[in-house]
Amino acid sequence: EWAVETARLGRDVAEAGGLQAAVGHRGVRLSGGQVQRLALARALACDAEMLLADDVSSALDAATEIELWDSLRASGTTVIGATSKAAALAQADRVVVLAEGELVDQGPWSKLAPRWAHLAG
């Protein structure tokens, strides 16, 4: 249940009828954001200290995305992710900018944004 709450799926699980509810073949009854949060909950349930994620919040609305990042931060789980979303970058403790596989800049998004905001969607 901790993983479900951390992934901001509690209400969705309750509305579906619980953790054992059928969601259809490959989750066809779920929205894109629900599929993303379900995948995150599954990863969190493994009790890993670190997660590697590719655009973990790309299908989420802004409010849910902020709740998700706040929840992940509170969980103490280290998340290393790839994203071009400014909202996700703003939630990061540290942002690394790569160009052609080379490290070209790093730091908090608040300091990097003036130079790199054109890359964030």
Protein language model annotation of sequence segments:
Residues 58-71:
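Conserved D-loop/post-Walker B switch-helix segment of ABC ATPase nucleotide-binding domains
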Residues 77-83:
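Conserved H-loop
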